[in-house]
Design a protein with these regions (language model features):
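Intrinsically disordered, low-complexity segments enriched in small/flexible residues
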Residues: 1-82, 89-92, 249-265
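General structural feature for long, well-ordered alpha-helical segments within catalytic domains
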Residues: 6, 25, 37-40, 115-122, ...
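Short hinge/gating elements
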Residues: 8-11, 104-105, 140
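Short, basic, glycine/proline-bearing loop/turn elements
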Residues: 72, 101-110
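Glycine-rich anion/phosphate-binding loops
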Residues: 79-84, 109-124
């Protein structure tokens, strides 16, 4: 008998198989558990349409950080992924799109040189193919084990997003729990439409760090998706079960955008 999964919000216990079938959302209270990239692909993409690229790109140890290779190996075994993001092309209701989906399970979704490169290449693939790009972001920020090389990815990904913007190619961001640090401070806030999953933690420094710095208590719900929408940082909050339908509407509304006049706005 499989071990039950406890919802951190309502404390209800769920069968893991049933929970996965419900898109990792608690049927009782609607709490959104963290979801792995391959499960998102199965839900979003037309059956059999996803074609991964940059699959075998793996991180090195550019600053010879002790234990980094071991952490990468452990993360790869745990997630069956080579890095913290999967990139590929697919169709959604027969409409072409480039997908990049991050995994918090792989070293906290931290952005090192490979993650930054893959996300940048995904955006440039959209530029090349003149089709929209959808990025699911979830990350603790820059990967400290790569030092300055990880911070360089902030500029790289932001530059790729700017290329899409200049060409008029739609970039849709979905901010998942949590999206923080250097990812928030770069490409995650540069989408044409910024979507968040319910209850997702979205910010730069986490609430505990902020409280410790300002020596004050923070308001309830600080940095959650609903708070960020109220403050204007998020355009809309979309439950997981409604995301495919939302993207069908968005892709239809933006059909042909960026393909006219050689991709120029």
């Amino acid at each position: 008998m499989s071990e039950k999964t406890t919802c951190p919000a309502c404390k209800a216990e769920h069968d893991p198989v049933a929970l996965k079938a419900n898109l990792m959302v608690c049927p009782g209270c609607g709490h959104h558990f963290r979801m792995e990239p391959n499960d998102r692909i199965d839900y979003l993409a037309d059956t059999g349409s996803f074609a991964e690229f940059c699959k075998n790109m793996k991180s090195l140890n550019p600053i010879d950080m002790d234990g980094y290779e071991e952490k990468l190996s452990e993360a790869a075994k745990k997630t069956n992924m080579s890095e913290a993001v999967i990139t590929g092309t697919c169709t959604i209701e027969k409409m072409p799109v480039v997908l990049a989906l991050m995994s918090f399970s792989f070293m906290g979704g931290s952005m090192g040189s490979v993650v930054g490169e893959k996300i940048s290449r995904a955006m440039l693939k959209g530029l090349e193919e003149k089709c929209p790009v959808i990025i699911y972001a979830t990350s603790g920020g820059a990967r400290m084990q790569e030092g300055i090389f990880s911070l360089m990815q902030m500029a790289k990904t932001a530059s790729a997003a700017a290329e899409l913007d200049r060409a008029g190619i739609p970039l849709f961001l979905v901010l998942c729990d949590p999206t923080t640090g250097g990812v928030t401070a770069s490409f995650a806030m540069l989408g044409d439409i910024t979507i968040a999953e319910p209850g997702a933690l979205i910010g730069f420094a986490g609430p505990r760090v902020v409280e410790g710095t300002i020596k004050q208590s923070l308001p309830e719900g600080f940095q959650r998706a609903e708070f960020q929408q109220e403050k204007g940082f998020v355009d809309l909050i979309c439950a997981r079960k409604d995301q495919r339908a939302l993207f069908v509407k968005l892709l239809k509304a933006h059909a042909g955008v960026g393909a006219q006049n050689g991709g120029a706005k």
